[in-house]
Regions:
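Terminal accessory carbohydrate-recognition/targeting modules of carbohydrate-active enzymes
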Residues: 19-241, 276-278, 283, 292-299, ...
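Bacterial Sec-dependent N-terminal signal peptides
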Residues: 1-22
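Well-ordered alpha-helical scaffold segments within catalytic/enzyme domains
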Residues: 225-234, 247-251, 285-298, 363-380, ...
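Extended, well-ordered alpha-helical scaffold segments
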Residues: 202-224, 237-244, 295-313, 323, ...
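Aromatic-lined, polymer-binding surfaces characteristic
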Residues: 277-278, 332-338, 356-361, 368, ...
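Extended ligand-binding clefts on enzyme/binding-domain cores
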Residues: 312-349, 355, 423-431, 448-546
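Helix-terminus loop motifs that line ligand-binding clefts
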Residues: 91-93, 259-270, 295-375, 379-400, ...
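Solvent-exposed loop and edge beta-strand segments that line ligand/cofactor-binding
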Residues: 46-48, 210-220, 224, 230-234, ...
Length: 637
């Protein structure tokens, strides 16, 4: 009996190993079929499965203010033909979406070179092949856009209705020899945009132009690539993902030509159709760091100045129904959550009150200090020093509680005030931000000691209250049981990734503990956000994978970092070089309870197989930016 049992176990293990080997060798397949174009003013989404532009919007942000959403000005733009494209892709990793047909290409873009609120479609081919081609579209104020099945604003119900009055036009022009370009233009008027001649003027300009606008747009983005630092050691796939990430970062930043002056420079957490096309401080801070690392200094500076100028400070005091004041209690400049499209601070509400997130202070401090350190922009530092001291760094210090941790807030996962906690992530990023700011203050011969001391206080508070068994860190000070929802928290790894704690032995023991409970099953590493039956929390989070990879690099574990980083690269390579919020995991999906399955209409994360792109796509700060920061660290000498 014992021999039979042993043989059965060995056979089972062999079969599992064989299956795992087969799965490991299985090539990745595309799982995301939408592409986005934006010029920081307008944004449009191409649906490759349906061969159409789902919709085009007059702004890249979700809400003007607390009471008004942004609606599309046109929907379902389709080529008036039964022919389907052979291939769809971003043209040379730019913002131009190209659909290749047998005898012509169709190119979709918002124009950076023109900087206008016109959506352009350019058919390119021989005259006889394109002269009779045209498009049909859903237009008209109040008309519902058909075919949209997922929310594009988590507070906005379906269906989505068109707003504004459509303006259209077309023109044919010779490109070279017998090749022509046929331009189709879509714009609008509304209460904020009243230029009824915008399309006719653009058509006249196209007709007279000596260059192709399509070529001008591609050249614009390629020039941006050349302005960035892209190490020659990158693989071809890595270079493609980095270039596309540069385009995404550029597309996600509001243009200086946006009609709302306080919105200039704000960076979306995602592009449409991803749900999070809102300027979060957290995501924006990582995006700014990535811009700085790339050499996109002008864009990084604009991102910082947007937050330094934005109207804010509205939650200095916030008394919740439990009678506690969750505000910082002092004047502050950086939003406690995110920003409306008009540039004002927004702390989004639900039945449990607003989100109030003090980690934003620390993350902004880090992004600010990183920019100044890498650019040596002393004039910028001096210009904003008073605001940075009094309304950012001092505001952070004021949030340190009596136990040497940042006071309770909504946390990095935004649970509002339902269960406020003192989070490891929050204290960790605030400690690191103050630490870096103190060093810069000292470098500029300015007062620094209180920031240095505050950083040391927070670090000691983390070691005292968050370190368990001298081996690993829990997610917050409040939860005592390992079964608690946020006891184990993927955000914990930020204290290693940002360089606050550089104890390799402690990192490895923390890794060992979290591998038991937060790592997905299978041959490759991958990590969930929280132990949960909610699919938005229990799937594999790309941002967490990348921050763990960054922590591995700081600990000298380059091979372990590569396992996480390479999978992101390989996935992006088959999905137009974009990066999602999450990857699906079937075993984790089986843990999702029925009451959470309806969440799919907003979270886009219910799938029946592994390794699918899910959640918000494309992610900017938590996607493209986090990838760039990790990849560049990997190739650092």
């Amino acid at each position: 009996m014992k021999i039979r049992y042993i043989l059965a176990v060995l056979l089972s293990l062999f079969c599992q190993s064989l299956l795992s080997a087969q799965e490991a060798g299985k090539p990745l397949e595309p799982s995301y079929f939408k592409l986005t174009t934006s010029n920081g003013l307008i944004v449009a989404v191409y649906n490759a499965k349906e061969n159409r532009i789902d919709d085009a919007y007059p702004h890249i942000f979700a809400n003007y203010d607390s009471g008004q959403y942004v609606y599309p000005f046109v929907g379902n733009i389709r080529l008036n033909s039964t022919e389907r494209p052979e291939k769809t892709y971003y043209l040379k990793n730019t913002h131009i979406i190209t659909a290749s047909y047998k005898d012509f290409t169709v190119n979709y873009f918002s124009s950076f070179t023109r900087g206008d609120i016109i959506f352009y479609i350019v058919i390119k081919g021989k005259k006889q092949n394109i002269k009779d081609l045209s498009f049909i579209a859903e237009t008209g104020k109040g008309k519902a856009v058909s075919g949209i099945t997922l929310l594009e604003n988590h507070l906005q119900d379906l269906p989505i209705h068109i707003a504004g009055n459509i303006l259209t036009g077309s023109v044919m022009r010779r490109y070279a020899n017998d090749v022509y370009e046929k331009y189709f233009l879509y714009s609008f008027t509304d209460s904020l945009h009243t230029d009824t001649a915008i399309v006719s003027r653009a058509i006249a300009r196209l007709a007279k132009s000596k260059t192709s606008l399509l070529d001008d747009e591609a050249r614009y983005m390629k020039n941006l690539f050349s302005r960035c630092t892209i190490p020659p050691a990158f693989s071809a796939k890595e270079k493609n993902v980095v270039e596309q990430s540069i385009s995404i970062l550029k597309m996600a930043q509001v243009s200086d030509k946006e009609i709302f002056p306080f919105s200039h420079g704000q960076i979306m957490a995602s592009l449409r159709p991803g749900l999070w096309h809102v300027a979060w401080v957290r995501d924006g801070s990582y995006a700014i760091q990535a811009m700085t690392r790339l050499g996109m200094y002008a864009e990084a500076k604009k991102g910082l100045e947007f937050m330094l100028k934005a109207p804010s400070g509205y939650f200095k005091h916030y008394i919740y129904k439990d009678g506690k004041d969750y505000g910082p209690g002092v004047d502050y400049q950086i939003s406690l959550t995110r920003y409306f499209g008009n540039g004002k601070e927004e702390c989004d509400y639900n039945e449990f009150g607003p989100n109030i997130e003090f980690d934003d202070f620390g993350l902004f401090l880090t992004a600010f200090c990183d920019y100044v350190s890498r650019t040596n922009d002393s004039a910028f530092y001096k210009k904003w020093n008073q605001v940075m001291c009094t309304k950012v760094a001092d505001a952070t210090v004021s949030c340190i509680d009596t136990n040497s941790l940042i006071k309770a807030d909504s946390g990095p996962w935004e649970h509002h005030l339902e269960m406020p906690r003192q989070y490891t992530f929050t204290s960790g990023v605030c400690a690191r931000g103050l630490e870096q700011f103190g060093k810069l203050q000292r470098q500029f011969h300015l007062p620094y000691k209180k920031y240095k001391l505050a950083a040391e206080t927070l670090k000691q508070g983390i070691m005292t209250h968050m370190l368990c068994d001298n081996r690993y860190f829990k997610g917050n000070v409040n939860d005592q049981l390992k079964t608690a929802h946020e006891y184990y928290d993927g955000g914990v790894f930020e204290i290693f990734a940002n360089g606050l704690i550089r104890d390799k032995k402690l990192f490895l023991s923390n890794m060992e503990e979290y591998d038991k409970v937060m790592r997905i099953k299978g041959n490759r590493p991958g990590y969930i956000r929280l132990i949960s039956a909610d699919p938005y929390e229990n799937q594999e989070w790309v941002f967490i994978n990348l921050r763990i990879a960054q922590a591995h690099l700081l600990a000298g574990n380059k091979p372990d970092a590569a396992k996480l980083l390479d999978f992101v690269t390989e996935q992006a390579a088959v999905n137009n070089n974009t990066i999602p919020e999450m990857y699906s995991n079937k075993l984790q999906m089986d843990k999702v309870t029925d009451n959470f399955r309806s969440n799919n209409i907003w979270c886009n994360c219910i799938r029946d197989k592994d390794d699918q792109y899910i959640g918000t796509i494309p992610m900017v700060g938590y996607g493209s930016a986090a990838y760039i920061l990790t990849l560049y660290s990997y190739y650092d000498k």
